[in-house]
C-alpha cells in the first residue's frame, strides 16, 4: 500500500522543513557572533558524516545541509515499516520518479520488475547521463541508506597503485581500522552464511566459481549479524531477510544515522537542515561562500528559498553532486581559480552486472544482504571482484547474480553545458569495454567449468548480457592531489573542501565506502591539526 500523507502530516513536513531552515539561519549567525568560522557541510553521506563528527568533537558548530528526508524521524507506514521492500515499492522508494528504476529491468525479457509509484522524496535516486545511470542514496545518511552494506577494505598493493599520493602504511595502520570500527563493520558468521537457507544462492555461486579455480571470500558488512540470527528464528522483525535493501532498511543495517552521524548529533553542535538543496555556490569578494538554498516538502512542493553565507564549506554531496555544484560555479565564474582538473578522472569503479543460469537450486529464500564474493584479483586489467548479489524474487529462479568490480583503466569526465544548464558525462560503451571484457573472461571460465550453465540475457535493458550502463560506485572528478591538495582542500580556493568519493580517481577495486570514510578521517585529522577551521 502506498503511503499518502494526509493534510496534517503534509503540514508537519512543511513546518519541519521551515523550522530546520530557520534553525540553520539562527545557528549560523550565532556561530559568527561567537567568533567561530561559519561552517557548512553539503551532504550527509560518509565524508560529510566524518567531517561533522570530527568538527563537533573539537567544539565546532556546523550546519549540515541535506536535500533528502530525515528517515530516522519518518513515521512508519501502516505495515509497521518506514522503508519499502524491493517487491513492494511505494513513493518512499525513489526520488521523484513515476516508476521504479531498478538495475534489473525485466525477467525473461518481460516487464515484471519495475512498478508505478507516486512521486515523492524517496530513498533511491537516479542520476541519468547519456550512457550512464548513477544510483545514489537520498536522505540523512546518503548512500548508507541504499547500499547493501558491503564494507570492504581494498588490497593494500592496489590502493597504492590507485592512490600513490597517500601514505598507504598510515592508511592501513590507522585510518582503515578506525573507519571499520566507527562504521560497525563485522565479518559474516559461518552459522548464517555457511549453513542457512538464506545464503544458499551464495554458497552455490561460490562452489561453481571454485570449479573454475576462483577463490571466494566472506565479505564484511555493516549489518548486525546477531539481528539477522533473530530474524532467521522469527524472533525479530524481518528486514535484511525481508527484502529490504536498495529502498532502505528498517532494523539490521548500521547506517550512518546509527553510527558516525549519531555520534556527531549527540554533541548538540550539528544544525541539520533537511529537504534542502544547495542550488549554487558563489565565492564573494571577501573569500566567504554564499549558498543558494531551495527547500521542498516530501511531495516536492516549494517551501522556500534562502541564501546563507559561510566561511568554510565542505563538499560532501557525492561524486555527482559535488562535481555538479563546482563545475557550475566554474562555468559561471561564481568561483574563480577552480582547477582545470575539476571533473576529470571519473569512473564507475568498473561496475558491470551480469547474471548466469546456474542449473541448480539457488533457493526461494534469499537474504537481501550480500555476504560473499568471488575473485581473481591480481591488480591487472583482467582483475574481477564479483559480489554475489541476491535475487530476492520470493521464488527459486535458478539465477546467479553478480555485481562485478573490474580494473578498467579508462576514465570519464564531467563537463558543464552552459546552454542547457546541466552537467554532462563523457562515458560510453567503448570506455566500459575493458571492464566488460574482464567480466566476460571471468564468467566464461565459470560457465565452462559448470556444464549446463549459461548467461541469462533477460534481466537487463536491451537484453544486454553485461550491464555496463549503471553504477552504484561513482568515483572521481575532484581527485585528491589533483583538484584538491593532499588534505582535501580545493587548490586555489581556500576554505573550500571536498570530502566524498570525488577524491578517488574512478576506481578502488572494492565497494568504496570504507575507503571514502578512511580518507575523510585522515583528511579531517590533518585539516584540524593545521587549524583550517579556526
Question: How would you describe each model-predicted region?
Answer:
Residues 111-136, 140-143, 147, 161, ...:
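FAD cofactor-binding and catalytic pocket of flavoenzymes
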Amino acid at each position: 500500500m502506498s503511503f499518502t500523507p494526509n493534510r496534517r502530516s503534509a503540514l508537519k513536513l512543511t513546518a519541519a522543513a521551515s523550522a530546520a531552515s530557520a534553525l540553520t539561519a539562527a545557528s549560523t549567525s550565532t556561530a559568527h557572533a561567537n567568533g567561530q568560522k561559519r561552517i557548512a557541510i553539503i551532504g550527509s553521506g560518509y565524508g560529510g558524516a566524518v567531517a561533522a563528527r570530527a568538527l563537533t568533537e573539537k567544539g565546532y558548530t556546523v550546519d549540515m545541509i541535506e536535500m533528502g528526508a530525515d528517515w530516522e524521524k519518518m513515521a512508519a507506514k501502516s505495515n509497521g515499516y518506514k522503508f519499502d521492500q524491493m517487491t513492494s515499492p511505494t513513493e518512499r522508494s525513489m526520488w521523484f520518479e513515476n516508476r521504479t528504476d531498478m538495475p534489473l529491468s525485466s525477467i525473461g525479457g518481460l516487464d515484471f520488475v519495475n512498478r508505478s509509484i507516486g512521486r515523492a522524496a524517496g530513498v533511491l535516486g537516479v542520476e541519468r547521463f547519456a550512457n550512464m545511470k548513477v544510483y545514489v542514496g537520498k536522505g540523512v545518511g546518503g548512500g548508507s541508506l541504499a547500499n547493501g552494506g558491503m564494507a570492504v577494505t581494498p588490497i593494500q598493493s592496489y590502493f597504492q597503485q590507485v592512490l600513490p599520493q597517500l601514505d598507504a602504511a598510515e592508511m592501513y595502520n590507522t585510518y582503515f581500522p578506525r573507519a571499520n570500527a566507527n562504521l560497525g563493520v563485522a565479518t559474516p558468521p559461518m552459522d548464517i552464511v555457511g549453513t542457512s537457507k538464506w545464503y544458499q544462492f551464495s554458497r552455490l555461486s561460490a562452489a561453481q566459481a571454485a570449479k573454475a579455480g576462483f577463490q571466494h571470500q566472506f565479505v564484511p558488512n555493516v549489518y548486525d549479524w546477531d539481528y539477522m540470527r533473530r530474524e532467521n528464528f522469527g524472533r525479530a522483525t524481518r528486514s535484511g531477510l525481508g527484502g529490504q535493501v536498495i529502498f532502505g532498511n528498517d532494523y539490521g543495517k548500521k547506517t550512518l544515522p546509527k553510527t558516525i552521524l549519531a555520534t556527531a548529533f549527540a554533541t548538540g553542535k550539528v544544525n541539520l537542515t533537511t529537504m534542502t538543496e544547495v542550488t549554487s555556490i558563489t565565492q564573494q569578494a571577501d573569500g566567504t561562500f554564499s549558498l543558494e538554498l531551495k527547500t521542498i516538502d516530501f511531495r516536492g512542493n516549494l517551501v522556500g528559498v534562502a541564501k546563507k553565507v559561510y566561511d568554510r564549506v565542505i563538499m560532501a554531496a557525492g561524486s555527482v553532486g559535488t562535481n555538479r555544484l563546482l563545475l557550475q560555479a566554474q562555468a559561471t565564474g561564481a568561483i574563480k581559480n577552480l582547477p582545470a582538473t575539476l571533473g576529470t578522472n571519473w569512473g564507475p569503479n568498473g561496475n558491470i552486472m551480469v547474471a548466469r543460469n546456474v542449473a541448480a537450486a539457488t533457493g526461494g529464500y534469499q537474504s537481501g544482504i550480500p555476504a560473499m564474493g568471488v575473485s581473481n584479483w591480481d591488480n591487472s586489467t583482467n582483475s574481477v571482484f564479483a559480489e554475489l548479489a541476491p535475487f530476492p524474487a520470493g521464488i527459486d529462479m535458478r539465477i546467479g547474480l553478480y555485481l562485478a568490480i573490474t580494473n578498467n583503466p579508462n576514465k570519464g569526465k564531467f563537463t558543464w553545458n552552459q546552454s542547457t544548464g546541466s552537467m554532462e558525462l563523457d562515458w560510453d560503451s567503448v570506455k566500459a569495454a575493458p571492464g566488460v571484457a574482464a567480466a566476460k573472461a571471468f564468467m566464461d571460465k565459470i560457465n565452462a567449468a559448470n556444464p549446463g550453465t549459461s548467461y541469462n540475457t533477460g534481466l537487463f535493458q536491451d537484453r544486454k548480457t553485461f550491464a555496463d550502463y549503471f553504477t552504484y560506485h561513482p568515483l572521481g572528478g575532484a581527485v585528491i592531489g589533483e583538484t584538491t591538495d593532499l588534505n582535501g582542500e580545493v587548490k586555489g580556493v581556500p576554505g573550500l573542501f571536498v570530502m566524498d568519493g570525488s577524491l578517488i580517481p574512478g576506481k578502488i577495486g572494492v565497494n568504496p565506502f570504507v575507503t571514502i570514510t578512511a580518507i575523510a578521517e585522515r583528511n579531517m585529522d590533518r585539516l584540524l591539526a593545521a587549524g583550517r577551521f579556526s
